[in-house]
Amino acid sequence: MRLLVDTNVLLELLLKREHFENVFNFFYQANIHKEQTCATAMSIRDIGYVLNKQLHDPKKTRLIQLQAYEMISKVINTSADAAIESIYSDVNDYEDSLQMIAAEEAMCTAIITYNKKDFEKSKLPVYTPEEMCEIWSK
């Protein structure tokens, strides 16, 4: 399985937010099940933006961005075609559309997010980290 991990899931772990333990468990289980976890380069950029706004410390921001790189198995680049397709997409949010298209291009099998409503038009199944862990436990 190749799983696209959405930005909000990565931020939960990196900023030790409400779902920190569940996301930690998700990555632990993904490793045990030898699943490939992916994020888009855009997500890594967005993480840097959010962190810099909160931390006001560019060095600390870069270190945490490196942690994000280390957590995932693969960084997915978005193609120019995906960018254009996202503009014409019927998905209202450009970034969500781009995530979905990038996941398809990278042959991901599912999207992992806490904002499932943002991915209602996804051709791929969409799960929270907790739901994915439940699937693995069966």
Predicted regions and their residues:
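Generic structural signal for short, solvent-exposed loop/turn connectors between secondary structure elements
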Residues: 15, 82-93, 119-126
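Short, well-structured N-terminal submotif of metal-dependent ribonuclease cores
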Residues: 1-39, 54-59, 121, 130-138
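Short beta-strands and strand-loop turn motifs
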Residues: 8, 79-81, 112-114
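A residue-level structural signature of the nucleotidyltransferase/glycosyltransferase Rossmann-like core
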Residues: 2, 36, 75, 111, ...
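PIN-domain endoribonuclease scaffold, especially VapC-family toxins
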Residues: 24-93, 97, 101, 137
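Acidic side chains
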Residues: 6, 12, 46, 93-96, ...
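Acidic, metal-binding active-site segment of PIN/NYN-like and related structure-specific nucleases
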Residues: 98-138
